[in-house]
């Protein structure tokens, strides 16, 4: 199911293979976010060409639109979307709990209002599992409570306890899954930014022995040093034979920090979100194409990059597309930023293979930061 093929000698970074129903996934792996089963401004064939083997879709959003009944009619999420690689489906917990004025948490589940039409709905660990089972997701995420940064200890403890209870119920549903369904269940550790809660949560989750473990509730607005502290601590509590997933990280700093600490999978909407506003990721920092300085620029966005944008079009032309609000500009920028993420991961993999990850991480981030400072 998960095989480690190389450990870096100077860090906890590692290379692995995660075996999933729709093909093996080489780790570390950046997972693009296709919330509704599609990447914004990117066709499936472009993603496949870039080498994407695992995409994230969101249960909350798919439940509200198009609806579970529609996806069930097609047989599963793969048939509905025609995506023939792997899907990880988030439980939707983060989205539900971000609706702070529109939801009520109970031991049984969570009552919430739709952000679309205000209609009321109720999620339980069992119902969320059932939806993902209908999707035939390759990786299923348990319903959890992602508590915000800055809450007090008692509230964090309560949410941690509920998350553990929901994990047990999800595992029970998973053990009774339909015959022939081979998706993997990842349970989620919580605990906010309190180490004793993190330890308690992780020990309880590990007792359930799910195929994979996610570290939830970090990268939620805390300072980077707090992120690093909890990331390192929580990752150290998880056995090395388990695939580890940190949810919602997508900047070069956070990703390389995660890889350094033995994390195998991560996702984020950031690369495509900033692309839609004309921000291009490069090895020298972020290039903001709407700036006047690029009007006459005949260079590619990044010489080393082999995406469609960088092999065919100039910075000046891309700026023209954005200023003209042409859809092609967003499509090209989105492809470029996803390609950048995959290139970054491949560079990290090469460094791990050569036991050079620590040096690579420092040199890469120094160069990236210098480019951003010189804007």
From Swiss-Prot:
Pathway: tRNA modification; tRNA-queuosine biosynthesis
PANTHER family linked: QUEUINE TRNA-RIBOSYLTRANSFERASE
Entry binding sites for substrate: 90-94, 144, 190, 217
Record Gene3D superfamilies: Queuine tRNA-ribosyltransferase-like
Top-level taxonomy: Bacteria, Pseudomonadati, Spirochaetota, Spirochaetia, Spirochaetales
Subunit structure: Homodimer. Within each dimer, one monomer is responsible for RNA recognition and catalysis, while the other monomer binds to the replacement base PreQ1.
Protein name from the UniProt record: Queuine tRNA-ribosyltransferase
InterPro entries reported in the protein's UniProt record: ArchSynthase1/Queuine_TRR, TGT, TGT-like_sf, tRNA_ribo_trans-like
UniProt catalytic activity: 7-aminomethyl-7-carbaguanine + guanosine(34) in tRNA = 7-aminomethyl-7-carbaguanosine(34) in tRNA + guanine
Keyword Metal-binding: yes
UniProt similarity note: Belongs to the queuine tRNA-ribosyltransferase family.
BP-aspect Gene Ontology terms: queuosine biosynthetic process; tRNA wobble guanine modification; tRNA-guanine transglycosylation
Cofactor(s), by name: Zn(2+)
Enzyme class: transferase
The protein's Enzyme Commission number: 2.4.2.29
Keyword Ligase: no
Task performed by this protein: Catalyzes the base-exchange of a guanine (G) residue with the queuine precursor 7-aminomethyl-7-deazaguanine (PreQ1) at position 34 (anticodon wobble position) in tRNAs with GU(N) anticodons (tRNA-Asp, -Asn, -His and -Tyr). Catalysis occurs through a double-displacement mechanism. The nucleophile active site attacks the C1' of nucleotide 34 to detach the guanine base from the RNA, forming a covalent enzyme-RNA intermediate. The proton acceptor active site deprotonates the incoming PreQ1, allowing a nucleophilic attack on the C1' of the ribose to form the product.
Residues that bind Zn(2+): 305, 307, 310, 336
Keywords tagged on the record: Glycosyltransferase, Metal-binding, Queuosine biosynthesis, Transferase, tRNA processing, Zinc
Provenance organism: Borrelia duttonii (strain Ly)
Chain segments carrying region RNA binding: 248-254, 272-276
């Amino acid at each position: 199911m998960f095989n480690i093929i190389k450990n870096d000698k100077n860090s906890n970074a590692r290379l692995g293979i995660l075996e999933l129903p729709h093909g093996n996934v080489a780790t570390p792996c950046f997972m693009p976010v296709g919330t509704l089963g599609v990447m914004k401004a990117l066709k499936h064939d472009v993603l496949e060409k870039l080498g994407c083997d695992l995409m994230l879709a969101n249960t909350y959003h798919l439940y509200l639109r198009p609806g579970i009944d529609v996806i069930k009619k097609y047989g599963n999420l793969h048939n509905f979307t025609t995506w023939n690689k792997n899907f990880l489906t988030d439980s939707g917990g983060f989205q539900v709990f971000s609706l702070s004025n529109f939801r009520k948490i109970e031991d049984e589940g969570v009552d919430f209002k739709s952000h679309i039409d205000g209609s009321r709905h109720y999620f339980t660990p069992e119902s969320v599992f059932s939806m993902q089972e209908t999707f035939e997701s390759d990786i299923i995420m348990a319903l959890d409570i992602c508590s915000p940064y800055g809450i007090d200890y008692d509230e964090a403890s309560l949410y941690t306890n509920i998350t553990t209870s929901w994990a047990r119920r999800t595992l029970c549903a998973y053990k009774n899954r339909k015959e022939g369904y081979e998706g993997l269940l990842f349970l989620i550790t919580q605990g906010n930014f309190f180490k004793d809660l993190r330890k308690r949560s992780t020990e309880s989750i590990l007792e359930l022995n799910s195929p994979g473990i996610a570290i939830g509730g970090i990268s939620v607005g805390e300072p980077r040093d707090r992120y690093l502290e909890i990331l390192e601590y929580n990752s150290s509590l998880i056995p090395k034979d388990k695939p580890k997933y940190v949810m919602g990280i997508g900047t070069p700093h956070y990703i390389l920090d995660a890889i350094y600490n033995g994390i195998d999978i991560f996702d984020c909407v950031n690369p495509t979100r900033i692309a839609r506003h004309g921000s291009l990721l490069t090895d020298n920092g972020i290039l903001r194409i709407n700036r006047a300085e690029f009007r006459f620029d005949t260079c590619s966005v990044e010489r080393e990059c082999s995406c469609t944008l960088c092999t065919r079009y100039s910075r000046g032309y891309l700026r023209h597309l954005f200023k003209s609000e042409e859809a092609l500009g967003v499509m090209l920028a989105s492809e470029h930023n996803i390609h950048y993420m995959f290139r970054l991961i491949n560079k990290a993999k090469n460094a791990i293979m050569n036991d050079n990850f620590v040096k690579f991480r420092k040199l890469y981030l120094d160069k990236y930061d210098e480019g951003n400072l010189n804007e």
